[in-house]
């Protein structure tokens, strides 16, 4: 079944709202990418509106971590997800989203990119 992002047919009172127009393709959505930690890297290219392309990162084990103290950015391995404010169940499934705290070889880092839409995991090293 398709994900539809249009307005509901019901008001908060329960009354039915009659549509002025039918459903359009532009109102469709897609399921979230939910980027997970895995041994292999898996990307999915999706056509967007206006014939543009969006790269969805589905599986990865690396992140570009920026160290603010030394002004250095390194590609390091990600071991696990420590905290994720988006959903508490993402922690045990090792799902990375923007704002997630991840454990890397350099230490704890906070994800600053949107892996499901950018196709890459960028993070900032957290100071202890």
From Swiss-Prot:
Gene Ontology MF terms: structural constituent of ribosome
Keyword ATP-binding: no
Any one GO cellular component localisation term in the record: ribosome
Subunit structure: Part of the 30S ribosomal subunit.
The family this protein is said to belong to: Belongs to the eukaryotic ribosomal protein eS8 family.
PANTHER family cross-referenced by the UniProt entry: 40S RIBOSOMAL PROTEIN S8
The name this protein goes by in its record: Small ribosomal subunit protein eS8
Organism: Methanococcus maripaludis (strain C7 / ATCC BAA-1331)
UniProt lineage: Archaea, Methanobacteriati, Methanobacteriota, Methanomada group, Methanococci
The gene coding this protein: rps8e
């Amino acid at each position: 079944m398709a994900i539809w992002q249009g307005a509901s047919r019901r008001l908060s009172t329960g009354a039915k709202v009659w549509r002025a127009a039918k459903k359009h393709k532009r109102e469709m959505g897609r399921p979230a990418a939910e980027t997970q930690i895995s041994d292999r890297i898996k990307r999915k290219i999706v056509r967007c509106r206006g014939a543009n392309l969006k790269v969805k990162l589905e599986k990865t084990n690396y992140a570009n971590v920026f160290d603010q103290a030394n002004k250095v950015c390194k590609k390091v391995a990600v071991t696990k997800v420590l905290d994720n404010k988006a959903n508490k169940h993402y922690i045990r499934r090792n799902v990375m989203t923007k704002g997630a705290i991840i454990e890397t070889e350099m230490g704890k880092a906070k994800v600053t990119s949107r892996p499901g839409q950018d196709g890459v995991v960028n993070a900032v090293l957290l100071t202890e």
